[in-house]
Amino acid sequence: MNVQISDSFSRDPDWWRGAVIYQIYPRSYQDSSGDGIGDLAGIVKRLPYIASLGVDAIWISPFFTSPMNDFGYDVSDYRDVDPMFGTLSDFDAVIETAHAHGVKVMIDLVMSHTSDQHPWFKESKASKDNDKSNWYVWADAKPDGTPPNNWLSIFGGSAWHWCGTRMQYYLHNFLTSQPDLNFHEPAVQQALLDVCKFWLDRGVDGFRLDTINFYMHDAELRDNPVLPVELRNSTIAPAVNPYNWQEHLYSKNHPDNLKFLRKLRAVMQPYNAAAVGEVGDAQRGLEILGEYTTGNELMHMCYAFELLSGDRPTAQYIKDVMDKVEDVASDGWACWAFSNHDVVRHPTRWNLSGDALSMFTTMMMCLKGSVCIYQGEELGLQEADVAFEDLQDPYGIEFWPDFKGRDGCRTPMVWEKSNQNGGFSDSDKTWLPVSPDHLGLSVAQSEADENSIIHHYRRAIALRQSHDALKSGTCSPMSVSDGCLIFTRAGAEEEIYCAFNLTDDTVALDVPTGDWQVIDTTLNSAAPAGGKLNLGPWQPCILQRKLT
């Protein structure tokens, strides 16, 4: 199906630059069938609400046919919708409805690996001489029967699993049921490019590409070196996971990834489609972001992990991150997020007050780059407390209780307080329980409260959308004064001065020189007075001056 959309909607090839993207985790957004699991028809129902937030696009996490061992990130058919979520016709309705509301659609493509139930893998493991025998990463055991090297899986244990049929190991960077595709095989690359074209022809406007730095591996299968203790962190894997003990020099970040990304960009170009690549690396994430987004032949943007940090970011931390982006990716483009389907929701993670949550929201909309917001974030949802017996996430089950997994950020969206399921589903039991603590923050109640965070999100998004300087302008070097973050964004016709107090204290700053005006008092922006700019705790200041 080719969905026709207006020229004005589709013409701009740079629509992604500075875009606000709303992430939907479909299992948890809206159930239309009564089975306790969200679906595509549910998304269609809620698209008017999404459009009302002022976002540019939605990103839908995987909905493809899957055994759901990793909740859709283990694909068994790239060209169909899992019956749990509906049909291809339902997906076409998502495209049509989103476009009718001026919202673009990005889908989450998982190309580094498939499910072990994919026909490709079933054929590949059957013998060493079939047409797809080289489509996955197979290797002989060492003489003592142990795996070919020391590579580790993010989900724990060796990254190699024994297959008695082939009498070889296969590589899996994630679950044993998620075998890695062999990108050194040209036929694999072409098959995946054909998948991309299938969805582009169906009307999608772009892709969120899962784990793009895992596509290629070292063909010699050399051991990863030990990572010095002082360089280890839990950016990508929880601290209890020994995955953090290696420098993943050979298992990912292969330079030949760039060759495939060029091919992918060429496929997307005629459609004016855009891709945001997820780069998961605990030591070199921003450097890889720069490598993968520099110029106009690779990724349009990369999803950055630095603001998904466990510790609440200080002004100095944010300045250091942005300085490094300018240093290693000055010609690239980052996509920022505070929350997603893999991390503890940021109001809980950072222990934010209401004022701090509002200020971080405003700050996000002023940063250079594109922005992803995660469903329920606009309601101020805290992380849900999910009992062990209700856990679904294999990651959490494996490392419980030191790491409780990702279910706490994946509980169903709350639309109203009328029943225990918050308007998400009519089922007696939902796939994850709805958090009772979330019911009082439902969309219906938040809409009725003019002081709720949802209205602040709308205003902050509207600020970004109404100023090209904030969407796609340049950014001055950032500075820090008494815990305040200060920078200026500039476009062709205006400059916007941004100051954010990331402390619990009142701070007095010097007023910037020039004819500056407060541009949005609804965001609690401070105004200059008596030659000073007095910022209360967790208060922003957004000023504008015209250049023409």
Locate each region found by the language model:
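Solvent-exposed beta-hairpin/edge-strand motifs
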Residues: 512-523
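Generic enzyme active-site microenvironment
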Residues: 106-107, 208, 276, 337-338, ...
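C-terminal beta-strand-rich structural cap/linker in extracellular carbohydrate-active enzymes
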Residues: 529-548
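Hydrophobic residues within beta-strands of alpha/beta enzymes
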Residues: 58, 207-209
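Acidic/aromatic-lined carbohydrate-recognition and catalytic surfaces
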Residues: 2-197, 201, 214-283, 413, ...
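Surface-exposed beta-strand/loop patches in extracellular or lumenal glycoproteins
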Residues: 502-514
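Loop/helix patches that line or flank the sugar-binding groove of alpha-linked glycan CAZymes
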Residues: 2, 15-18, 220, 224-253, ...
